[in-house]
A protein has these predicted regions:
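Elongated scaffold/linker segments in the mid-to-C-terminal portions of large proteins
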Residues: 17-167
């Protein structure tokens, strides 16, 4: 709210407090790109998350089914969520987060998917691989969809702090 209200000094102050008090650390590249736990299992970077279980899971009523292109249930596998080329091209090659999206030249990065390389080769350019089914289980929604859902990550606090300091 402080950012929204233009109270940048307060925004920076409280972002820093959240970073310091949480003890959270940013995700590593290996955590980010892990094909079985990437963005489905809470890490030390996650300050706040939801933890649904298999017992309250439906094949369409779940986060992973709407956001993971690797999952065979839900809508994501049908819509093939992608990033716009102009945005992809704006991300530096040195930023490992860029490779959460399929580069037109698949040899640019050693993409990992539990679905295998043949499946990856068939997918559209710029398709997202950021969110993964739990344990890599893309067939069984009650297993693969029982994923932790990130609500607030420490990386967001660093971005708020940087933006607030820059705007002060």
């Amino acid at each position: 709210v402080y950012m929204w209200d233009g109270q940048f000094a307060k925004a920076a102050e409280y972002a820093r407090k959240a970073i310091d008090k949480s003890g959270a650390t940013p995700m590593s590249e290996s955590q980010w790109h892990n094909p079985t736990t990437g963005f489905n299992t809470a890490t030390s970077a996650w300050m706040w998350y939801l933890h649904p279980t298999a017992s309250n899971m439906g094949n369409l009523a779940n986060f992973i089914g709407h956001i993971s292109n690797e999952a065979d249930w839900g809508y994501a596998s049908l819509s093939k969520l992608q990033m716009a080329r102009s945005l992809y091209d704006a991300i530096p090659a040195t930023d490992f987060r860029k490779y959460s999206y399929l580069d037109p030249d698949r040899s640019t990065y050693a993409y990992q998917s539990v679905r295998g390389n043949a499946w990856l080769d068939e997918q559209p350019d710029y398709m997202s691989l950021k969110f993964r089914p739990v344990g890599g289980d893309y067939n069984t929604y009650s297993v693969g969809a029982a994923a932790d859902i990130p609500v607030m990550r420490v990386e967001e606090m660093y971005l708020i702090e940087a933006e607030a300091v820059g705007a002060s």
